[in-house]
Amino acid sequence: MICKKASSKWIVLVCLIFILLTAVCASVVYGYTGTSWRQVYQAFTSFNGTNEHVIIKDVRLPRALVATVVGASLAAAGALMQALTKNPLASPGIFGINAGAGFFIVAGSFFLHIQSPQALVWSSFLGAAFTAAIVYAAGSLGREGLTPIKLTLAGAAMAAMFSSLTQGLLSVNELELAQVLFWLTGSVQGRSLDLLMTMFPYAAAALVICFFLGQKINLLVMGEDVAKGLGQKTGLLKFVMALCVVMLAGSAVAIAGPISFIGIIIPHFARFVVGNDYRWVLPFSAVLGAILLVCADIGARYIIMPQEVPVGVMTAIIGMPVFVYIARRGAKL
């Protein structure tokens, strides 16, 4: 733990928020079409309809905001899952929640011809909730009850199954294959503010709720018996935490597709900075997750310019070595 005093944690958090704002501004400025900081300022103060101004306001700004919200949502969901399951490798991606949400979106589009953003968000929520329930039930089977290793294995099985089913549906409808495949790799390109505003209320509500649960989560992590002895309603708390995970992961997948590794690695960085106090781990995870995804999106524009790498590929490149390190180190919550 780097920051031991509350004052130092506040200072670091404010600095991280400033870094996030800087990264968002950089995301609006830099890309294939050359623009300057001056043009960005003019686009918001004296918009004149030029190509650069349109790109800044209608393409890059929504993209930066989407990356911010999605990164914060996935990181906070990962921190909640690691506390809920007592598994340092837990995340919406590893437990199959992202894959389940993605499958329900593709299935809804294929069978029910769902097109509206609101319907896509609810399809994603339904898939995330269904997958979470199945993984939890499968992980609870056997004499030992719920264990981290069984949860991980059940999640991996569900992720593989839903990924296979999704690919099967896409192979039948080849006309939409290219666009949907780009979405399934995880991307914030081409997302509109209207789509963001459709999912933002759910993600914002879940973030606010989980921030207020920090102290209760601290007691739960100490042990369920300890939490019950201190008057904690552990069943209700777990339900609310699971609901927040579904809302955060479901809304993120609905707008950006299944982006992996943010939910795994970011909570560990947050705990490295502020320790195991979830009053701080959750907000730090949200800000760090937003920073990572915004910066990864900027990098994705330059690797094979003029083409773009899906940001999900960038997070996988960054996250895989960290994931292996965490697994070998046997990180503790």
From Swiss-Prot:
Consequence of gene disruption: Strains lacking this gene show a reduction in growth stimulation by the iron-hydroxamate siderophores schizokinen and arthrobactin compared to wild-type.
InterPro entries cross-referenced by the UniProt entry: ABC_BtuC-like, ABC_transptr_permease_BtuC
Main localization of the protein described in the UniProt heading: membrane
A Pfam family per the record: FecCD
Name used for this protein in its record: Probable siderophore transport system permease protein YfiZ
Membrane-topology descriptor: Multi-pass membrane protein
Described purpose of this protein according to its UniProt entry: Part of the ABC transporter complex YfiYZ/YfhA/YusV involved in import of the iron-hydroxamate siderophores schizokinen, arthrobactin and corprogen.
Family annotation (CDD domains): TM_ABC_iron-siderophores_like
Transmembrane segments: 64-84, 94-114, 119-139, 152-172, 193-213, 246-266, 280-300, 303-323
GO molecular function: transmembrane transporter activity
Entry keyword Glycosyltransferase: no
Organism domain of life: Bacteria
Signal sequence extent: 1-31
UniProt entry tagged with the keyword Transport: yes
One BP annotation, GO: siderophore-dependent iron import into cell
One Gene Ontology cellular component: plasma membrane
Gene designation per UniProt: yfiZ
